[in-house]
């Protein structure tokens, strides 16, 4: 099937080029220009056939195509052989027609691509659209960059507007911040546990320096078709296909990235009695050797270590950054030795009594010290009904997500964590406590990383190779639950004009980012890369392939309309100058100006092709 998809991808790209050049051809004939040749591809002709006055060709270099119209070359002459005549005097020639007619011919190619795009998007719309992951287009946030979290954006929030435009998903947040180096967001904190509340924030953000600003929310459904690894911490949890992870250590969870971040933050989940009420707190664990302990409290810690039955040096023990008495009451904070360089959130208050650590009841500070050496998580899973797992229209999916919780039952289960008699099951919710997460390498086979190592070792640049190999080794040590999760599918089917607007907008944003130096040309794809993208689209399904065909057709139109010499937009600019100046072009100067741009264009396509081939063979 791979070969079939490759052939379909190549045919799709060839079709888009054909349509573009056909637009030029038909427009030229419509205004009375004489067309000499029509070619798909450049270079030596692999196939050629003359029909009437036009020679039709397929070139050996598949970088595009061209329509050669009589009189476009300065060296063209009319049949009289009069050397004093210019290209403007050649009958049925390109320059013999008015500038407006020439603009019509030049714009006809991109216009043909836009018409194809709207036609393809129309087929996609009336066939029901595409099945996509909920996270891809949701307005609900699944994970937030720490710098934005400090500004008030949290996982579970719903964004309505991003930099003044209706929000269409996490990709929009990335592209907007890439162009404007800031994010201005308006939205709401949905009514999960309390009343919904509007929010607005504006913060500087540079993706080139900070990475991704946020990710979309996901349903975090257990993929029962993939058996749990034998060493998974949840292997005996009794999970079923479609069970949804909704809560972990006091927080609703909205994405795999959020879950991973929480697992690797080295925090303990505490049940605390505060002023007659029970509250839940996540507090960072720190090494005792990193704290400013007085000799008295150091001896107290050593005594506590002995009582807890912990071996090793006291400085290597994890502890909470507080002085905690024998009954579990917080007496004072303890600062870090290097608190000027490292910030630490203190979430406990003086007088708090710790009654449970990671869901396990405690009676003394020795119990607390013993339990904070490791981290066990408390999880709540939701049994999803068949109706809740039904594929929804994307427009209705966000509200369905917000309404998918039964907060009364969920709160009752969550609030029982750390009690002597926990509510292990209520309604659709089930509590799984004292789960011991493990490093990735402990759960999974090393063989799964061998392919990534092999790809990384192929990088020629030593620093780049070392960087990726180090990342792979670091990933091995990341703490994991060892559970395969999937997202809920939604039906994404905006009307054709919305897809057109988004495609044109994305293309123009890319051009703008390139011009401002905020996007590297290495992000772009040439003909080989486009074929690979289309190949992937066909392998996913016909709707996905149609979406990519429409998007690439729009990109071809936008690219060719750029005001760059040798492109359609460059020639249109010359025609407009001719109209405004009311003077004919000096073809000698025009050709001299075109040569360097032609060389740069060829070099650019060669660069893109080599880059595409590098992705194919190196990865």
Curated annotation (Swiss-Prot):
GO process terms (BP): proteolysis
InterPro entries the UniProt entry points to: Pept_M50_Zn (IPR004387), Peptidase_M50 (IPR008915)
Record-linked CDD domains: S2P-M50_PDZ_RseP-like (cd06163)
Key words, A-Z: Cell inner membrane, Cell membrane, Hydrolase, Membrane, Metal-binding, Metalloprotease, Protease, Transmembrane, Transmembrane helix, Zinc
Known cofactor(s): Zn(2+)
Transmembrane segments: 103-125, 558-580, 593-610
Compartments it resides in: Cell inner membrane
This protein's GO CC annotations: plasma membrane
Enzyme Commission numbers on file: 3.4.24.-
Location, primary (coarse class): membrane
Active site: 21
Topology of this chain in the membrane: Multi-pass membrane protein
Domain of life (superkingdom): Bacteria
Binding-site residues, Zn(2+): 20, 24
The keyword Transmembrane appears for this protein: yes
Single Gene Ontology MF annotation: metal ion binding
Keyword Transmembrane helix: yes
PANTHER family: MEMBRANE METALLOPROTEASE ARASP2, CHLOROPLASTIC-RELATED, REGULATOR OF SIGMA-E PROTEASE RSEP
Family: Belongs to the peptidase M50B family.
Name by which UniProt lists this protein: Putative zinc metalloprotease CT_072
Organism: Chlamydia trachomatis serovar D (strain ATCC VR-885 / DSM 19411 / UW-3/Cx)
Lineage: Bacteria, Pseudomonadati, Chlamydiota, Chlamydiia, Chlamydiales
């Amino acid at each position: 099937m791979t070969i079939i998809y490759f052939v379909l991808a190549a045919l799709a790209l060839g079709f888009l080029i054909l349509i573009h050049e056909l637009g030029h051809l038909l427009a030229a004939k419509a205004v009375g220009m004489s067309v000499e040749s029509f070619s798909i591809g450049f270079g030596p002709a692999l196939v050629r056939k003359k029909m009437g006055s036009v020679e039709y060709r397929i070139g050996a270099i598949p970088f595009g195509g061209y329509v050669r119209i009589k009189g476009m070359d300065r060296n063209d002459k009319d049949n009289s052989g009069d050397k004093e005549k210019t290209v403007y005097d050649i009958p049925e020639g390109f320059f013999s027609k008015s500038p407006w007619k020439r603009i019509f011919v030049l714009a006809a190619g991109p216009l043909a691509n836009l018409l194809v795009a709207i036609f393809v998007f129309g087929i996609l719309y009336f066939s029901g659209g595409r099945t996509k992951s909920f996270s891809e287009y949701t307005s609900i946030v699944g994970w937030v960059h720490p710098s934005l979290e400090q500004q008030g954006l949290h996982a579970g929030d719903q964004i309505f507007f991003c930099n003044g435009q209706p929000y269409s998903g996490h990709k929009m947040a990335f592209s907007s911040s890439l162009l404007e180096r800031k994010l201005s967001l308006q939205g709401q904190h949905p009514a999960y546990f309390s009343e919904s509340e509007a929010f607005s924030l504006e913060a500087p953000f540079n993706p080139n320096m900070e990475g991704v600003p946020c990710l979309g929310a996901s349903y975090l459904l257990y993929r029962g078709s993939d058996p749990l690894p034998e060493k998974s911490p949840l292997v005996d949890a009794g999970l079923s296909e479609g069970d949804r992870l909704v809560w972990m250590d006091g927080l609703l969870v909205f994405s795999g990235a959020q879950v991973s971040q929480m697992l690797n933050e080295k925090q303990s989940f505490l049940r605390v009695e505060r002023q007659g009420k029970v509250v839940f707190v996540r507090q960072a664990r720190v090494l005792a050797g990193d704290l400013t302990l007085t000799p008295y409290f150091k001896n107290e810690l050593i005594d506590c270590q002995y009582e807890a039955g912990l071996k090793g040096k006291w400085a290597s023990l994890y502890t909470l950054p507080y002085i905690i008495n024998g009954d579990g009451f917080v007496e004072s904070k303890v600062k870090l030795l290097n608190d000027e360089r490292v910030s630490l959130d203190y979430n406990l208050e003086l007088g708090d009594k710790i009654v449970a650590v990671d869901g396990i009841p405690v009676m003394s500070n020795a119990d607390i010290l013993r339990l904070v050496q490791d981290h066990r998580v408390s999880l709540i899973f939701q049994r999803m009904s068949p109706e809740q797992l039904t594929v929804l229209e994307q427009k209705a999916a966000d509200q369905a997500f917000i309404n998918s919780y039964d907060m009364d039952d969920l709160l009752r289960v969550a609030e029982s964590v750390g009690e002597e008699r926990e509510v292990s099951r209520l309604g659709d919710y089930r509590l799984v406590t004292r789960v011991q997460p493990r490093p990735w390498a402990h759960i999974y086979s090393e063989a799964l990383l061998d392919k990534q190592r092999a790809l990384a070792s192929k990088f020629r640049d030593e620093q780049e190779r070392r960087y990726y190999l180090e990342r792979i080794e670091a990933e091995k040590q990341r703490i994991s639950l060892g559970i395969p999760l999937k997202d809920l599918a939604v039906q994404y089917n905006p009307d054709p004009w919305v897809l057109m607007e988004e495609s044109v907008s994305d293309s123009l944003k890319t051009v703008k980012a390139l011009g401002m130096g905020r996007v590297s040309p290495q992000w772009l794809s040439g003909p080989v890369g486009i074929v690979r993208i289309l190949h992937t689209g066909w392998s996913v399904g016909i709707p996905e392939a149609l979406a990519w065909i429409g998007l690439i057709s729009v990109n071809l139109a936008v690219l060719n309309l750029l005001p760059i010499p040798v492109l359609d937009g460059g020639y249109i600019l010359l025609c407009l100058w001719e109209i405004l100046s009311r003077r004919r072009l000096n073809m000698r100067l025009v050709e001299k100006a075109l040569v360097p741009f032609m060389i740069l264009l060829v070099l650019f396509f060669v660069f893109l092709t080599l880059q595409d081939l590098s992705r194919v063979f190196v990865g």
